[in-house]
């Protein structure tokens, strides 16, 4: 959306940049200005300067600069509109949308106003109406203090007649209430329920979650607002408005199942806690965590079978998205709320610290699903776990997980790696059978080049030795890439994956005089037989120069012999021309020069 220049100027003149940046950076006064260590790069001596009179910041170390809007976009990942809305709310500035976009924006603004008025009315009913006393007593019994109730703006929805009357007094019609999701076929969805506002990351109320606190009444235990133009359940992370700053700073999150659990966790100081809204955690929710910069997720789900099942599912989603999942198991029958009430925050911190990595939890769960863990069951567990692990990030990461798996199930690492190779080969065979009847023109064109033999050939081992040198070469040592570049070309690599790594490495080296990262190169072989061969053997980096010379020598020797054998086969009588002999002899001489 686009705002008028006048309203944006009003906002910019209203912003106190020190109060905004001070929430994220430890500022120290330096004369008329402020300084700090830059949040955008590592440094020990402050070079990040904030100029209050100009409403501007500048880092003289990395060059980052801008105003409060730029800072929020960079530091918090806000879009321009989100940053503007956040600041407008903080400094009480009314923004005006440009005329051509006013219609759609008016709808959102109208819905925000209805939600705001409803939220205020529900709070009033909880604290000041006789009907709210029972709900208030229930909240106190559950451990919600007056400060907690006020902080999270918890309220109580009375019966339908009072609600409609109160809204009409605020110029909100029944038709508008139906549009906003409060009424459905003349039924007030939230009548006589405790109301928990659902807010977006900027603090605007976009919907409600209601809880039945006594027997009777229509609907289930929880009723949530239906989806609207503001409220999309699959994208909402409950508690984000209270946890976003801490999550951005620490890049970790605690995930719980319910809103009450989330609020109690935050109230006890665990200000990086989130819950899903109206549904279980989905891939979309995990994608939102990735956008927030989360690198580690603590799964604190209920201590029952459903909670264990949720940990298995959400943990796999996190791992596949590159987020390290830590499973924290609560005692049987407890949830985070009850655990806090009974044992306190210190014991919960200890429980979080004792959390186990997701792979260990996954293996434990699968092992304990069998009455007897025989060798046959062990093989089945390894295969099932590998099917999940092979989707968890970069090839190097996958290899480390497979090493851990081997340790957990007490089998040699090569055995686990061979399982990965066999699973990958089986998947490839299945895909070939499906498409065998109607091969595409593209497959016909490429069918004769770059195939990896299902039985690893001696030549493939030699090619892998050279590629392994590129993978493990020290960044400061140019001998390895320079030597490989001097003596080898794509022609020497028959394995398509190794040839692709060679081309990537040489192009990168030609452009920047450095090699690509190991992850970049390994991404070309993930899940293939070629990867299995690369990670199956260790590399002595202290002898790297000798190894690369020997590896190139052996590969070129093999290449020369293969070409000679092929020529003999084609002519049926060996070398039949002096020209061919001289050419091959020249290549053989080139090989000798490496020694």
UniProtKB/Swiss-Prot annotation:
One of its GO terms (cellular component) is cytoplasm. A zinc finger (CHC2-type) spans 38-62. Its cofactor is Zn(2+); Mg(2+). One of its GO terms (molecular function) is zinc ion binding. It is an enzyme of class 2 (transferase). Residues 251-331 form the Toprim domain. The keyword RNA-binding does not apply. SUPFAM superfamilies: DNA primase core, Zinc beta-ribbon. CDD domains: TOPRIM_DnaG_primases (cd03364). It holds the Pfam family DNAG_N. Residues 430-441 have a biased composition (Basic and acidic residues). The keyword Isomerase does not apply. Keywords: DNA replication, DNA-binding, DNA-directed RNA polymerase, Magnesium, Metal-binding, Nucleotidyltransferase, Primosome, Transcription, Transferase, Zinc, Zinc-finger. Mg(2+) 2 binds at residues 302, 304. It catalyses: ssDNA + n NTP = ssDNA/pppN(pN)n-1 hybrid + (n-1) diphosphate. NCBIfam families: dnaG. Belongs to the DnaG primase family. This is DNA primase. The lineage of its organism: Bacteria, Pseudomonadati, Chlamydiota, Chlamydiia, Chlamydiales.
